[in-house]
Amino acid sequence: MNKILTENEIKKFKEDGAVFLEKKFDINWINKLKTGIEKDISNPSPRFKSHTTKKNVPAYLEDYWTWHLIPEFKEFVYKSPYAQIAAELMSAKKINLVMDNWFLREAGSKSSTPFHHDISYFDMDGTMCVLWLPLQPTKKNEGVVWVRGSHLWNKFFLRVLFKDGHKIEGNECIVNGKKYELPPDILGNKDKYEFLQWDCELGDAVVFDMRTLHGSLNESIPDKTLSRYTL
C-alpha cells in the first residue's frame, strides 16, 4: 500500500500537535459529507444540539455518534483515506473509531468554539488523533486555531461546554490518578502562545493530537454557513 503522508507531515504532527494536510480528500467525499449533514439535520439523532442559547438567530449546531445512521458518514468511515492517514500519523497497525461528529455554524452566528482539548471528553487512554475536515473553503479567521505543542504539556484540563457562555464543567480534581486543571485563559494571554492556523480549500484538512488545545481565536461572524466533519 502506497504511503499517503510524507515524513515531514508525520514529524509536524508529533512535534506541533497538529498538521495541515493539503488535498488529501477528493471532492466527492466533501459532497457526500455535506449531504450526510443535510440528512442528519432533517432527521437528527437524540444527541443533536444547538450551542446557541438564543432562539430564532443563526445557530451553531452539532450531532455526534451518527456514522451508523447516515450512509454517507458510514461510507466515509470505511472507505475514505482517513483510516490510513491516522495509522501513518500514529505508527499504528490498527485504528479504532472513538467518535464521529459534525459542526455547522450558520451564516451570522455569534456562537464560537471554546478553547479545550478533546481528551477531557473521553474516559479512555491511548494515542488518539482527530480529523478536522472543513466542507467549505475556510479562511484562517473563520476556523479554529491550535496551540502549538500543547499536547506535550502533560496536563489535563476540565471540560468546557460549547454552549454560549462556555461554562467550565466541574472543579479542579483528581480522577483515576489524573489531575484535571482549569483551562488556561488563552484569549486573555494570546501573546504567550504560538498558534497554528491555515486557510483551507476543499479537500484540505487538519489532523491534531487529542491533547492539543484548540478553539476560536477571534469572534469573527461568518458571512456564509460553515460546516466541518470530524473523526
Regions found by a protein language model. Name each.
Residues 41-55, 159-164, 202-207, 211-231:
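Non-heme Fe(II)/2-oxoglutarate
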Residues 117-132:
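Acidic, His- and aromatic-enriched active-site or binding-groove loops in soluble protein domains
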Residues 130-133, 148, 224-231:
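A short hydrophobic beta-strand segment most commonly corresponding to one strand
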Residues 82, 92, 107-110, 136-140, ...:
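Short, charged/polar surface micro-motifs in flexible loops or helix N-caps
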Residues 101, 117, 133-137, 146-148:
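Short, structured patches in soluble enzyme cores that scaffold and shape functional sites
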Residues 140-213:
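Double-stranded beta-helix
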Residues 1-16, 22-115, 121-122:
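Non-heme Fe(II)-dependent double-stranded beta-helix
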